[in-house]
Amino acid sequence: MAQTFTGRKRIRKFFGKIKEVAEMPNLIEVQKASYDQFLQIEEPKGGRADDGLQAVFKSVFPISDFSGAAMLEFVRYEFEPPKYDVDECRQRGMTFAAPLKVTLRLIVFDVDPDTGAKSVKDIKEQDVYTGDIPLMTMNGTFIVNGTERVIVSQMHRSPGVFFDHDKGKTHSSGKLLFAARIIPYRGSWLDIEFDAKDIVYARIDRRRKIPVTSLLFALGLDSEEILNTFYEKILYTRAKDGWRMPFDPKRMKGYKAVADLIDADTGEVVVEAGKKLTVRAARQLVEKGLKALKISDDEMVGQYIGEDIVNVHTGEIYAEAGEEITEKVLKTLGDAGFDEIPVLDIDHINTGAYIRNTLSADKNSSREEALFDIYRVMRPGEPPTLDSAQAMFHSLFFDAERYDLSAVGRVKMNMRLDLDAEDTVRILRREDILAVIKTLVELRDGKGEIDDIDHLGNRRVRSVGELMENQYRVGLLRMERAIKERMSSVDIDTVMPQDLINAKPVAAAVREFFGSSQLSQFMDQTNPLSEITHKRRLSALGPGGLTRERAGFEVRDVHPTHYGRICPIETPEGPNIGLINSLATFARVNKYGFIEAPYRRVVDGRVTDEVVYLSAMEEGKYYVAQANVPLDTDGRFQEDLVICRHAGDVLVVSPDRVDFMDVSPKQLVSVAAALIPFLENDDANRALMGSNMQRQAVPLVRSQAPLVGTGMEAVVARDSGAAIAARRAGVIDQVDATRIVIRATGETDPSKSGVDIYRLMKFQRSNQSTCINQRPLVRVGDVVKKGDIIADGPSTELGELALGRNVLVAFMPWNGYNYEDSILLSENIVKEDVFTSIHIEEFEAMARDTKLGPEEITRDIPNVSEEALKNLDEAGIVYIGAEVRAGDILVGKITPKGESPMTPEEKLLRAIFGEKAADVRDTSLRLPPGTTGTIVEVRVFNRHGVDKDERALAIEREEIERLAKDRDDEQAILDRNVYGRLSEMLVGKVAIAGPKAFKKDTEITKDALGEYPRSQWWLFAVADDALMSELEAIRAQYDESKKRLEQRFLDKVEKLQRGDELPPGVMKMVKVFVAVKRKIQPGDKMAGRHGNKGVVSRIVPVEDMPFLEDGTNVDIVLNPLGVPSRMNVGQILETHLGWACAGLGRQVAAAVDAYYGSKDQQVLRNALVKVYGPDDIEVLDEKQITELGENLRKGVPMATPVFDGAHEADIEEHLEKAGLNPSGQSTLFDGRTGEPFDRKVTVGYIYMLKLHHLVDDKIHARSIGPYSLVTQQPLGGKAQFGGQRFGEMEVWALEAYGAAYTLQEMLTVKSDDVAGRTKVYEAIVRGEDTFESGIPESFNVLVKEMRSLGLNVELLNSKTGRQTNPGTRENLPAAE
């Protein structure tokens, strides 16, 4: 593999044997591609494609007014640059969005009142602002009101036609009732269904059903056409004693003769009664010369007439089409002299009489009646007229504005019904409806299969772009109504397009979608993996999708078509299981929204490297082999039979029948599951937990990439955007903790800058309060290629995902401290900050303008000691770096108090002695209970026009200095590049002119140039015209770049100095960020990658932990009983391989030390070649070899890809290479006694994660606090500073125990006895220990409720006999 900048610093030994031909697509492609297609920001030469935003505008415009005198047309749209960049939006709480400018054309017509002819009177074109459209950041997220959000893709039922049956559940007989449903992208649903009597009905939009023939009448067919469409006809002719029926062998399939079949010509019996006739036998009869059968009059009875039989002369109808033949009808026809009767070909075996029966049951017989009937169903209570009924029926399915099948729907419909309509025909056609009814009737006759709605060919993905498109269309349609009304109410000749447009409804629709749609979610930003998974999530919930309650087992289950498209492992546990899925690693979404998986094409039994993406529908036609089928060097299958998948089944076929082969074994799992080594040895349930828990791993202070990985770590780190990759190749010019400056070395476009400045995020807060901190990996002078990782982010190390730490584990019980999955840790882990993480909490204080005057942020707070103000600066805001504890003031703030009415004396004194300070109360922002930490950042926002305080000005100065430094650095590199080129071009040339004091016609030398300031070098002129024009070009470009740099700087400074847009009524806002360091402690949840989770039960002193023969203490002790029943053996194999990694690391470390001693590098090279083989090592130089060796001291990292990883033999081989026992077990000694344990113990390195369920966030205590308003009981929950609920079962426990006083206390003074709790407080203050409890407030609430029902309840005092009135809070003190 070609080594990257970070890749050669630490090479992973790779166990995979299958070569991967397909490149893994970018992991957040789903989001980016979809939204780019929606926006189409750059307008190409020939105009934009009819997609996304363009399609929405095209579908809504042109808009005409009601009279047709004016028309508003859409010309094009363009985006202006966004007002704030991503970082500014994050800090100021803004939405990262670009203003959308639409060019509209208003055409006014002159309408001739007599002829109605139109002529153009006036055309006006104008750019109109139509709101902001949120833009996607580089990482596939949106910033809405300062928070990062993700729009999750939705899985929904694809538009098209579906055939299904009720599985016999509707009718008691268990008969299968078939139904078809045409689902459009938008518009009315059409259902066509059978009932138990085999009559076919249609429903529109799930309303009352009507016979399907009424629908056909409304489409313009008459009874005869309907019958001709669905049935063949047979012509019976009169013979001398009966009728003659043409013999057709095709109709005889499965026919059983009831009576003898007699040849009409010869009179012979060809088939005896009771015999079955096969198609083959029937063919033989034809070959023997059988042309027609003889049918008696009795057999004619019960057949159906095929067309109206009419007297040609009088027009009298003897029999109608579809009428049943009776003896009476036969006699009438015979008397009238008809000797030929067309009969419908209905044999009740291959063809049923369903449509004919429906026709005879239908009370409507003409188009008008049918239309009226449909109108009554759709709009009950309105009297129908023919015009309104016709218009309504047309608008249901045949009006492109109301009904849209979408391209997908049309394609699916064509495929299912074998039609060939263009995919631009987005409305229903008559032939579509007829084809659906035909297919449904054939299903009832036993031909064909019903559809599987969980097949991924029938479910499609709606990504961001499409969801946004639908939402925007809703907004535009709202706007369209307003425009139409406004066009008719204004003087159309004088208005401009801008006067007609009100962008509010569109902006509101967009804001509503991003702010409150079920699919717009707060991004899970715990670590880079959780971000990527969130962006690749597929949800079946949301608007237009399923609901949890209605979703059955089938929808949630794994389907064969999920293979390579949706991960069968990663899904949440709980009520959403199976409804929320993850995209598989190699999957992508095609233009129709179906998920495609990649396959290698197989030609004549030889596997080629051509990669083809197939959707689930296409894949069903082919035979697909697995990725791990053994191949020879030529790419042919080694075995005679190959296991394949075909149409959802697994078969064994010969190699020449194979069409495709999987590209990679990991293509069937998602990103999170592909990060689990030895996934193939884990039970699926535990793998599910493992992939879900990796997403909850907290970024640690010192991340460490896993020793045993899968090779996916680098991919995730790169694609998630956590680690920074170089945008262009170049040389590192400057680097410090906050930024990296790279001088681009490739050919740069003159209009672009030759300098890349990367700002690193330092201690920023993520959505989940974890810490985002980036660290540079490069030094000045390093050469990087495009795409190389130059800085690590949270949970990444050397460009690889690092969610946890490698720790030395022993699998053994230890004094019961690892009972029930508990975890025992060594004190060493705490001491060395192995599992320490930093969490950043954000607090904000706002100074508002109140009715009584403005609030003020100040250090001058009444009744607060100087001690409490020690961390505040003169503006009343806490210093950066201050250590704060619960209850400390972060921002001092005072609020004016309402004046109490003054007595005359007070007024007099006030008048004599002047104003005393108005009353204010302390409303400072204090640190809530349970947090301690360090202030890492403070941001001050001022409203426009409010004077900035010292602190705000200081922050602003700092920011401007930073911007100026960026500008100066970029300028310096630009100068260096330009003047370097200038000097190269001028030196050695003869100057014909130059700066002052330069002699003409002398050669320019380096020294000569050095005598003049660089700005004067431009004054040199030489005789070579070509050179001079090149110099001019360079100068123009240089000046342009310089101007652009300065302008960018000034823009940013202007933005900084401008006031901030704050919520209404807020004058000033201060945000304070507190970093909290959380060491691991008992109660924290930890987990491995195999679903092996547990809670830390105890942290044991190092000297008591078990130790190895060389004295090394183990870090963590896990219970071996957690493995067998859970069947996640992967963790044991990982432990063994990790042990081998560490052993090899020790050997490399010894070789590095030997090299330092002897300076002979061959020792080190040999040690590395022993581990990796020669290919990777030969290309490295001495410095790189040493760096690699140093990085491998702790262990040689390995990659064991999913389903293609290390086997037991490989692990044993590596254990032996490392000089360790191949069993992977070691003798352990008890740290407390120093004696060896009886048996050898499995010891090795396992990768453990600390999860985001920290005991510090859960532990909580309250003495007094807020109470609920009505019941006066304490609130619940940590967030409300609530109490613990003493519930029904707890009451039973105290009752059973007989603890009467405790129980009374629980139900009164500790809960809602308002007077009682005050008395208790007073008693405690006085030091007494007697108190009485009174009436609980909830009892008063009960009494009040009974009174509201008209039942008066009074309490009588037993001593005095007078009533004590419940339900009033007399002379009670105010609640706390």
Curated annotation (Swiss-Prot):
EC number(s) per entry: 2.7.7.6
Xref: SUPFAM superfamilies: beta and beta-prime subunits of DNA dependent RNA-polymerase
Keyword Nucleotidyltransferase: yes
Reaction equations catalysed: RNA(n) + a ribonucleoside 5'-triphosphate = RNA(n+1) + diphosphate
GO molecular function: DNA binding; DNA-directed RNA polymerase activity; ribonucleoside binding
Keywords carried by this UniProt record: DNA-directed RNA polymerase, Nucleotidyltransferase, Transcription, Transferase
Record region (Disordered): 1357-1376
A Pfam family hit: RNA_pol_Rpb2_6
Statement: the UniProt record of this protein carries the keyword Cytoplasm: no
Class of this enzyme: transferase
Gene Ontology biological process terms in this record: DNA-templated transcription
Compositional bias ranges of the Polar residues kind: 1357-1368
Assigned GO CC terms: DNA-directed RNA polymerase complex
PROSITE patterns: RNA_POL_BETA (PS01166)
Membership in a protein family: Belongs to the RNA polymerase beta chain family.
Described purpose of this protein according to its UniProt entry: DNA-dependent RNA polymerase catalyzes the transcription of DNA into RNA using the four ribonucleoside triphosphates as substrates.
Subunit structure: The RNAP catalytic core consists of 2 alpha, 1 beta, 1 beta' and 1 omega subunit. When a sigma factor is associated with the core the holoenzyme is formed, which can initiate transcription.
Protein name: DNA-directed RNA polymerase subunit beta
Species the sequence originates in: Azorhizobium caulinodans (strain ATCC 43989 / DSM 5975 / JCM 20966 / LMG 6465 / NBRC 14845 / NCIMB 13405 / ORS 571)
